[in-house]
Structure formats: C-alpha cells, structure tokens
C-alpha cells in the first residue's frame, strides 16, 4: 500500500478539521488518537482517511520522509507524544507541533530532535475550528530543511489572501513565538472591544441591539476586523429560554489559557513595554475575583453615573476613535516586542510577511494590517511602527476623541484599563522627557545606584543627605 502523505495525531475538533483540510486539498492522510473511541468515531464518518490505533502502525502508514502533524494539548502531552515517536521515526522525518506550545519548550524539543536527525517545527495555527477546516493562518519556525519538506502542503491548506497565509518565520521557536505575540495582541483587542461594550451599555445605557448597530457601523469603516465581526454575532444571539440577549446572561468571569500571560512575561524579560496587553491579562485576573468584587461593590457603596446624559451626544463617534487608536497601539506593542525578540533570539522574523499572513485565516485579521504591512515595506527595520508617518498622522487625528473617551469613562466610573493603558503608552512613547530622572535620584539616595547626567558623560553618585 502506498504511504500516506501526512499523518495527524490528536483528534480534537482542531485536529479533525486539519485532517479534513489536508484531505480536501488532495493529500492522503493517516490519523491516530490516544483513545481508540475517538479514532473509531472519526473513521466511521470519514472512511477515506486511514485510521490507525497504535503509534507503530501510524508511523508505518506514512511515506518517507514522514510528515507528522501533532494537534495535542500543549505541555506534557506533547513531550509524551514525541517520546513515543522518536524510536519509530528516521533521520530526515519531520514532526510539526500545531498546538499553542510555549516557545522555550519548542526550542528545547527542536534541539533534542535535531540530535536524532529529526526536523521539529513549531507551527502556530490561528483561525479556530473553522479556520482549521477552511484555511488557517500558519506561522512556522524550525529548521529550514524541515520546512522545505512540508512548505508546499502547508501553503495549500492555509487561508489565501495576497498569497498563502503561511510563512517560514525563522529557526527554532520562531513560529510559536510569533503565535504567542498574535495571542497577546488578541487579548488586548478583545479587552478594548469589551470596554467599548461596557461603556455603551453601562454609562450610555444602550441596549444590546443598539450596541450591535454601533459595532456594525464601525465594522464598515476602519475597524473592520474578524473580532468586530464576531462581536456583532455575539450581540445578535438570543437565549432561547429567556428570549434575552445571551451575552447578558453569561457570568462575567473570563478564563484564559496563559498565552497572554506568556506575552507579558516575555515583554518584562526583554524590557519592552506592552501595557495594553498587560492590562488585558490583568483584567481577566480581576474578573476571576467575582465574589470579592461583589463584596467590594457593597462595602464601598459603589455608585456610578450611568445616566445617558453623562455621555455627550456624539459619544459613539469619539469612542470609535478611541477604540481604533487603542487597537493600533495593541498591534504596535506586539510588533515592537517581536522586533526585540527577533534580535535577541536571532530569529530574523520578516515583519512584513507577518503582517501579510495575519490578514487571512487568523483571529486578529483586520483592515489595519494593510497599513502595518505598508509601514514595514517602507522600512523593514522599523523598531516600532508608531514611528511610521502614516500611523503618527492617524493617532494625531484620533487624539482628542481618545482623551474625551477616557475622561467620560472616569466620570462615569466605568473601568477601561486597556484603552487607558494605550493612551498612557502613546503619551509616554512620544515624551522626550519622562520623570525617570527623579526615579534615578531616589534610587541613588537610598541604594547608591548611580545616575547619568544630561550635560556630561559618565556615571555619577551624590551624597544626597549632606
């Protein structure tokens, strides 16, 4: 029997859909799952795909060099699966990890398998269940030789916008690193949109239907994006039992899988400010403290000015500008961190290509990526695209609307940590002088840490108490 083109391990919904995507594009596919029941269920629905029930049978079903795609839960499950494969694979075979693995884990696995002559690729896959089936965004890192064995098939199953939304992004953990940044930006944008929803419903007292109409208008202009599209879908859904908007019945306790936290932690490690992403992570942490928040609301007798007249008549226009500016800043922080990481980890990430492939298939696809792509085409070494003239002009135009929104939120007592952090970041980034001189003076006084001067070179220390 002729060997299968690709093998997929892990038959969760994402794994099943990727297997079908490969099959729909003309590739012969073999699958394996840790539990036989899941494999049998899938095989019953899709007999054209080869079902296997042991790892040796799975590996022997594949043509050489073998191409194995893992879609298992990130962490120990990936290591366990790799451990079961290593004695069965041969030099030159390719193993692709399509889960949300932490990039240092990918670096380690890549190094370990390289010693065995096996190419290990960290493959970031974005697009959710539908993207996995119809065309995701695919971010690949690892040995280039390994990518050369699978690049064509990955291009074919990827979303297609200005070419395949699949790109080789660099060695070792580069692919999973870029996927981590993608997820950090995703956290930030979701939080910004949620804050807009909160302001409109709590301070503006708009109905869910009215907010949906506002978002629809925004999505027809510069805020056009996948996340805005699904925000509209969420607001359209009615609970069949109560006939109320389903979103209003959902407990306000947001969960997270950790990729946003990884982004913030890495930003701290590299010394790159990402306050909007940080605020989004912290906001989910705060939401988890539901019982404490209820107690605090009662003990402090929290009162908010939620009357509709507390917001100006053209507030939705101002808020649109603030949301747009905050989303631009969210992307800017992510790309800035990516730039620092690319240099620090010697990835050589092609930022123009990252912006391009994010335009299709992925969760953060948005109209603004066209402008981001143009910025990097004009200057491939741009540290932060807020330095690009087009973005500088855009944020200047949105400045007043941004500030008016923050002011209205403060007066209404509605927290907008991500929008607020975005504006603070923008003001800080464009400040020629910050109060760090005062901080350095304090550090020198209590800890003799020294300081630099603006009028002459060198490191200085003063006796502040004499």
What are the residue ranges of the model-derived segments?
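NAD(P)+-binding Rossmann beta1-loop-alpha1 motif at the extreme N-terminus of oxidoreductases
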Residues: 1-67, 92, 129-132, 453
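Conserved dinucleotide-binding and phosphotransfer motif residues
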Residues: 25, 45, 116, 270, ...
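Hydrophobic beta-strand scaffold residues
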Residues: 29, 51, 120-121, 274, ...
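Glycine/threonine-rich flexible loop motifs
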Residues: 67-84, 99
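Rossmann-fold dinucleotide-binding core
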Residues: 79-83, 96, 102-213, 220-245, ...
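Interdomain hinge/lid region at the active-site interface
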Residues: 173-176, 201, 206, 213, ...
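Small-residue-rich helix-loop
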Residues: 343-375
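C-terminal amphipathic alpha-helical interaction region
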Residues: 396, 404-466
